[in-house]
Swiss-Prot record:
Cofactor(s) annotated in UniProt: Mg(2+); Mn(2+)
Binding residues for Mn(2+) 1: Q284, E298
Ligand binding (Mn(2+) 3): Q820, E832
Gene Ontology CC, one term: cytoplasm
Top-level division of the source organism's lineage: Bacteria
Region (Carbamoyl phosphate synthetic domain) location: 547-929
Keyword Ligase: yes
ATP-grasp domain mapped to chain residues: 133-327, 671-861
Catalytic activity from the UniProt record: hydrogencarbonate + L-glutamine + 2 ATP + H2O = carbamoyl phosphate + L-glutamate + 2 ADP + phosphate + 2 H(+)
Keyword terms: Amino-acid biosynthesis, Arginine biosynthesis, ATP-binding, Ligase, Magnesium, Manganese, Metal-binding, Nucleotide-binding, Pyrimidine biosynthesis, Repeat
Name of this protein: Carbamoyl phosphate synthase large chain
Family named by the database record: Belongs to the CarB family.
Gene this chain is encoded by: carB
């Protein structure tokens, strides 16, 4: 069937900011889809609120709108652009929910917009739990015994029929938001009320728990002629009960018999046909390990996290083909882009095993609740490819960057067996490593199976890994065993530990004896057809399929899994760097291990190596490809941390030299540079022991900021006010030592400013200066950034420009540099310098139309900025006002304090742009999920040091008609100024504030941190309760102030004469 000619313009909805449950996989899907539609000749309009994506680049669609993804804003775009059709299935749950709202409100009908791809009735049938269950019953497909509830009372009725445990799944949410497993009445009450709150339809499905069944997924495609195929089937190692996004996944499935595989395949295709899905779809099934009984768990009628994984696992570009199916093309008339000879209707075949392991944020949130269930907690994931299951698992483990390199924890020997078994009996993110530890101690596989329900097949594989460890120990230095361990994915580091050698010695031993990996191609067809895709993985076999060319090559290191502090912004920079390398005539090679991103799409670079970002794995590639040099400044801290290790092997680091990278990080050298170029910084000292830190603080004066050197995203950084807090920090948060000193700095309160610049060694250009709304002390990634600055004087701007140029030249930067300044009462100080690409590069590139990462890469190759047409200094300002607002995923992370401070907590960002600051802020706040209302109730409970400041705020909110609730201390302060406030009780008292929050009486909470055990606990409970009830909680008065400005600009003030 030819494609549709009755439509010309298509609107694509993106997925918005990165949150837990909806990460970079949608940037990848959206980018592919927009390009595919343009390839077919359609005019594409994209709307997405996330500036950190490749998808929102001007080249990807014909028109790009970076606006909040709300019904109101998308409706405005539809009225303005008059598209013929809307494609909703590529923007995750956000895109689907928007399409449903636009349909229900009549916007699509009024503007004659058709929905492409899967029909709305099918989407609703898959998403609405009641309709889905009815359809499954009609098809005779078993679903777990369940009931749909709209109230907590109905939930208790169902519980009386079936008993515990029960699984709660809210309708129309993703990442399991609001869901969970209930074992008793208290949990049932809490989870169901939460779930009803988060479900747009106020509807939850309660089902009898089938935890312990195998969880199997099929990624399927169907077109309008009813051709349907399975692209990939995957098996979760963790049984049903853990969200698939938090499970360790293997593809293809390893433990299904052919009968089971075909049975579940038939069911998946039967369901997708009955639903009438056109495009990609994900089917999740539960299989009883002891019989042929199965249940269907759910169907996602859209491109998902699993489809990104399936695309990278097979090389089959699901999103691209789904977009083409949506405009009428069929599977039997589209060529598979990987082979170029076979059609898309051929099911991919794999001659390797892939492992996916989720990346959790608990290294950032040590107090977060680690227990895993049906609500997702991972921020990202890694994937690895191997020829054996063991090899792919071990490669995935060392891609995680947790400091674990193998099936065990670094301090594993110190745990006693009872503790290890206790940890295995709970489902959490470290269970896999504790299982390895238990097998090492001789625990039987039967005992582990009874505790975890993990299939024996996988337990035997774990056992094999431990057996090889013992063999290495018994045959130290034996080449036969070295080669054998390599076949099963062991790293040099692990072998060195068992051989009683250094990692370097093992590496040399391999080189001398020619024990090197070969690289195999990912070709979708297990070498059945000729294929020439430049997509490779390493393994220890005989035939190398990666043909090395004579062209000069540049290797770019990617940024690994998405985590807090290192998000999709770094992938954005990586992709732009690759494009610049290709334009300059070099061969561009990427090494990365994140299946969700655009950079690991094989069509981006000349060669993609899907490998762990470790010294060993990267060196193996360098030894084969012999590139001109390696670029580390676009891959975040992951890549920067590899620079000196690679340089030791004689690898050339392109761009800013290793010596200068270290000068920016090393405290003493950096201070010497600042003195030389005459740029002031807050007074600071270095401490290697608690005693030294206390002496430093006495000299500098409290408050001080303390942090370890060499970290990204402000890990383990704190502001402390007295000796006791400092002692506590030095003994508990960090273990300071001469190798790992702690920095103790004067904490300056003032405006925080962020600047990104590009330098070619001679000229420094500054695309933009951003002012933060939150004062210094809040991590730059969690602050609202404003461009152009709104409150700085000409003198301050001139000083910032001068200092930036001096720093870039003083450090001899080649490429990008990011600098944070604070403007205190007595002038401008530099807070920190990062000699690499930063979180704000995509944001500034979009605003100013200066392709920063590409210019930086051209400078690295040796081009001059003046030849590209740029003059030194701050570049002309773009018209309008732009804000970058942070987005948090606290509703998915229990026990995490949401107070903003020097440690980064946000998972994503949105951009708001308009003609005034207030309008831009309104869009930024709305896009980040803060509902801005022109009237309502605000609850204020602030620490003593903030009481004076909160008075002015309360006065202004009162004048625009907000009702004020306050705790007694805050209310007494307001009463002194005749500001009316209703007093609410402290926690546990009469009329207590938690109850008021839970009852929905409050629209905004303003709460600032008070130190001291009792109050800290209370404050923590207040903040958690607000998050769990979906209410904005502002922990910085600067944010509250900005919100008040926006509210004032929307309404009229009422003052008596």
């Amino acid at each position: 069937m030819p494609k549709r000619n009755d439509i010309k313009t298509i609107l694509v909805i993106g997925s918005g900011p990165i949150i837990i449950g909806q990460a970079a996989e949608f940037d990848y899907a959206g980018t592919q889809a927009c390009l595919a539609l343009k390839e077919e000749g359609y005019r594409v309009i994209l709307v997405n609120s996330n500036p950190a994506t490749i998808m929102t680049d001007k080249e990807i669609a014909d028109k790009v709108y970076i606006e909040p993804l709300t019904h109101d804003f998308i409706a405005r775009i539809i009225r303005k652009e008059q598209p013929d059709a809307l494609l909703p299935t590529l923007g995750g749950q956000t895109g689907l929910n928007m399409a449903i709202q636009l349909h229900e409100s009549g916007v699509l009908q009024d503007n004659n917009v058709q929905l492409l791809g899967t029909e709305l009735t099918s989407i609703q049938q898959a998403e609405d739990r009641e309709m889905f269950r009815t359809l499954m019953n009609d098809l005779n497909v078993p679903v777990p015994e369940s009931d749909i509830v709209n109230t907590v009372e109905q939930a208790f009725k169902f519980k009386e029929q079936v008993g515990y445990p029960l699984i709660v799944r809210p309708a129309f949410t993703m990442g399991g938001t609001g869901g969970g497993i209930c074992h008793n009445d208290e949990e049932l009450h809490e989870i169901v009320s939460n779930g009803l709150h988060y479900s747009p339809a106020t509807q939850c499905l309660l089902e009898k728990s089938i935890a312990g069944f195998k969880e199997i997924e099929y990624e399927v495609m169907r077109d309008k002629n009813d051709n349907a195929i399975v692209v990939c089937n995957m098996e979760n190692i963790d049984p049903v009960g853990i969200h698939t996004g938090d499970s360790i996944v293997v593809a293809p499935s390893q433990t299904l018999s052919d009968v089971e595989y075909q049975m579940l395949r038939d069911v998946s295709l039967k369901v997708i046909r009955a639903l009438g899905i056109e495009g990609g779809c994900n089917v999740q099934l539960a299989l009883d390990p002891h019989s042929f009984d199965y249940y269907i768990i759910e169907v996602n009628p859209r491109v998902s996290r699993s489809s990104a994984l399936a695309s990278k696992a097979t090389g089959y570009p699901i999103a691209k083909l789904a977009a083409k199916i949506a405009v009428g093309l069929t599977l039997d008339e589209m060529l598979n882009p990987i082979t170029g000879t076979s059609y898309a209707a051929f099911e991919p075949t794999l001659d390797y095993v892939i492992s996916k392991i989720p990346r959790f944020p608990f290294d950032k949130f040590e107090k977060g609740e680690r227990e895993l269930g049906t609500q997702m907690k991972a921020t990202g994931e890694v994937m690895a490819i191997g020829r054996t299951y063991e090899e792919s698992l071990l490669k995935a483990i060392r891609s995680l960057e947790y400091g674990v390199h193998h099936l065990g924890l670094p301090n594993g020997e110190s745990f006693d067996l009872d503790y290890i078994k206790e940890r295995i009996s709970h489902q959490d993110d470290e269970r896999l490593f504790f299982i390895g530890e238990a097998i090492r101690r001789g625990t039987t596989l039967e005992e582990i199976h009874n505790m975890t329900q993990i299939d024996y097949f996988f337990l035997h594989k774990f056992q094999n890994i431990i057996d090889i460890e013992h063999q290495l120990k018994e045959h130290q230095g034996d080449l036969e065993y070295l080669k054998y361990a390599k076949d099963y994915g062991f790293s040099d580091k692990t072998i060195a530990h068992r051989f009683n050698m250094t990692e370097e010695e093992v590496y040399q031993l391999r080189m001398e004896n020619d024990i090197k990996p070969v690289y195999k191609m990912v070709d979708t067809c297990a070498a059945e057809f000729e294929s020439s895709t430049p997509y490779y993985y390493g393994t220890y076999e005989t035939e190398n399929e990666s043909i090395v060319t004579d062209k000069e090559k540049i290797l770019v290191l990617g940024s690994g899994p998405i985590r807090i502090g290192q998000g999709v912004e770094f992938d954005y920079a990586t992709v732009h760097a690759v494009w610049a390398i290709q334009k300059a005539g070099y061969e561009a090679i990427i090494v990365n291990n994140n299946p969700e991103t655009v950079s690991t799409d094989f069509s981006i670079s000349d060669k993609l190596y899907f490998e762990p970002l470790t010294e060993e794995d990267v060196m193996n590639i360098i030894n084969l490809e012999k590139p001109k040099g390696v670029v580390v400044q676009f891959g975040g801290q992951t890549a920067i941390n590899l620079a000196d290790k690679l340089a030791k092997h004689g690898v050339k680091i392109l761009g800013t030299s290793l010596e200068n990278l270290n000068r920016a990080e090393d405290r003493k050298e950096f201070e010497a540079l600042l003195r030389k170029i005459n740029v002031p910084q807050p007074q600071g000292k270095t401490a290697t022991s608690p005693e030294e830190a206390l002496a430093n603080a006495a000299e500098i004066g409290y408050p001080v900021v303390v942090r370890p050197s060499y970290v990204l995203g402000g890990r383990a950084m704190e502001i402390v006010d007295n000796d006791k807090e400092l002692e506590n920090y030095m003994t508990q948060a960090v273990k300071a030592s001469p190798e790992h000193p702690v920095l103790v700095d004067r904490y300056l309160t003032g405006k925080e400013i962020e600047v990104d610049a590009i330098c070619d060694g001679e000229t420094v250009i500054i695309p933009g200066i951003m002012e933060h709304i939150e004062r210094a002390g809040v991590h730059s990634g969690d602050s609202i950034a404003v461009y152009p600055p709104q409150t700085l004087t000409e003198d301050e701007l001139a000083t910032l420009e001068d200092y930036t140029i001096k720093l870039a030249k003083g450090l001899n930067i080649i490429g990008l540099i990011n600098i944070q300044f604070v403007i205190a009462h007595d002038g401008v100080y530099v807070l920190e310098v990062n000699p690499r690409s930063s979180r704000t590069v995509p944001f500034l590139s979009k605003i100013t139309d200066i392709p920063m990462a590409q210019l930086a890469m051209r400078a690295i190759i040796g081009e001059k900025l003046t030849d590209m047409g740029y003059q030194e200094g701050v570049q002309p300002y773009a018209e309008g006002v732009f804000v970058k607002a942070p987005v948090f995923s606290f509703n998915k992370l229990k026990n995490v304090d949401i107070t903003l401070g020097p440690e980064m907590k946000s998972t994503g960002e949105v951009m708001g742009k308009d003609t005034t600051l207030e309008k831009a802020l309104f869009k930024g706040l709305t896009g980040s999920g803060v509902e801005v209302k022109d009237h309502g109730t605000v609850l204020m409970t602030v620490s003593d040091k903030d009481k004076e400041e909160v008075v002015k705020l309360a006065q202004r909110l009162n004048e625009v008609g907000y009702k004020i609730l306050a705790t007694s201390g805050t209310a007494n302060k307001l009463a002194e100024y005749d500001i009316p406030a209703e007093v609410v009780g402290k926690i546990g008292g009469e009329n207590d504030l938690l109850t008021r929050i839970q009852n929905g009486d409050v629209q905004i909470v303003i709460n600032t941190m008070t130190k001291g055990k009792e109050v800290e606990r209370d404050g923590f409970q207040i903040r958690r309760t607000t998050v769990e009830n979906g209410i904005p909680c502002l922990t910085s008065l600067d944010t509250a102030n900005a919100l008040t400005n926006v509210i004032e600009s929307m309404t009229f003030t009422m003052r008596q004469m």
